[in-house]
Each structure stands twice: as structure tokens, then as C-alpha cells.
Swiss-Prot record:
Protein's name according to its UniProt entry: Biosynthetic peptidoglycan transglycosylase
Naturally occurring in which organism (per UniProt): Xanthomonas oryzae pv. oryzae (strain KACC10331 / KXO85)
Transmembrane segments: 19-41
Membrane topology annotation: Single-pass membrane protein
Reactions that this protein is recorded to catalyse: [GlcNAc-(1->4)-Mur2Ac(oyl-L-Ala-gamma-D-Glu-L-Lys-D-Ala-D-Ala)](n)-di-trans,octa-cis-undecaprenyl diphosphate + beta-D-GlcNAc-(1->4)-Mur2Ac(oyl-L-Ala-gamma-D-Glu-L-Lys-D-Ala-D-Ala)-di-trans,octa-cis-undecaprenyl diphosphate = [GlcNAc-(1->4)-Mur2Ac(oyl-L-Ala-gamma-D-Glu-L-Lys-D-Ala-D-Ala)](n+1)-di-trans,octa-cis-undecaprenyl diphosphate + di-trans,octa-cis-undecaprenyl diphosphate + H(+)
Amino acid sequence: MGTDVWDDKQAAPPRRRRCLRWVLAAPLLFAAASVLQVLFLRVVDPPISSMMVGRYLEAWGEGDWSFSLHQRWRDYDKIAASLPISVVAAEDQQFPMHHGFDLQAIEKARDHNARGGRVRGASTISQQVAKNVFLWQGRSWVRKGLEAWYTVLIELFWPKQRILEMYLNVAEFGDGVYGAQAAAQQFWGKDAAGLSPTESARLAAVLPSPRHYDARSPGAFVQRRTMWIQRQARQLGGPAYLPAP
């Protein structure tokens, strides 16, 4: 009996050391796995994103078992040139210049929110891609930290055009309508390559709340925002403002 107790005491330190090694190795393993994940999606088009999975789970949780979403991938050069510049004009005008985070926009949003106005975000297109492709919905500090991590990796390993291509294919433009191709087909019965400048601006205009606003039958807010986006796109210089392939 005494020998058994002694053996247990001797076995405890190695077990603790193994646990400690795993605890120390876990962040490195996660970092390596996430880098491989981002590198993989640099060249492979994802059939579904984490946000789409979340939308399915949300619908099923509400008892809507018949819910289906619409999404079809389109390469960047198969999308009307008016859509990328419209999205950049609406969502992230510093996109070609920043490295994932628009510090000036963050500061403006912080000042605006501190004054007690309607809460304003400052997420760049790169941050939105990180959130939509890799993460879940939520506002926890853990998710925010992971969003920042994936944003850094995306900016490090993907060219700007790939980031924008990914965004145009996973962004939600209507309830269950993801990506430019599905939006063009569902709303106007055409291919994404045939979107007009006005249609492109309308799609960009609904991005703040795509389940609330309608690009096909725009209300007053979407109409005003559409005109503003078109003016901004012209002032930026049109499609030539964006990085070349």
C-alpha cells in the first residue's frame, strides 16, 4: 500500500508537466492552424461561411426548417466593376491604403458614440471578412480579439483584391441572400457582371442592415444612400481607385 502511494506521488509531477506543455502549446497550435486556414482560403473559394452557418442555425432555432439561403460564387473579374467601388465607397473608403484597421474611422466612431448619438461602428472590409468567414456572431471580447487576429492574417497573406472578392461573395445583401451573384439573380434576374451602377450602389446601400432594407424596392433611406454612394464613388475616381490584379 505504501508503495502504491509513493508511485502515485511520483506519477503526479509528470502528469502536471504534460498538462503544462499542452497549455503552453495550445496558443502556438491555434496560431499555426489559423495561418494554414487563411493560406488555404487564399486560393480556395469557400462553399459556405461561418455567418451562413449561423443564419441556418438561427432559422432552425426559430422553427423555420424550410429556410434556405442563396449563394453562388463569382470571381472578381466576373462581377460588374461598379459593385466593388460602390461597396468601398459605402463601407471602407480607406480600403486600398490601410492594413486592416482604419484608425481614423475608429477615433471618429469613438467620439461620435461618446456624444451619445446612434452607435456607429468602424469595421473595415477586412475586419468584416474576418468576422463573416471565420467567426461567429457576437460582441464578446474573445470574438473581438479573434477578429483582430484574423484581420492581421488576411491582410498579411491575401492581396487586397482577394479580400474584396471574398467580401463580395459572402456579404449578406438580403435575408438569406449572400454574395453579388445571388443578389443580382434574386433581385433583378441577371448575372453579377450585368449589374448597373445604380443597382450596385443599391446593394452597397443596404449593407448596414440587409434584412431591414430592400435593394430591389428601395425606400427613402436606401434611395438617399444610393445617391450618396454614387457621388462618393465618382469622387474616389471610380473603379480605377481600387488595386489592380
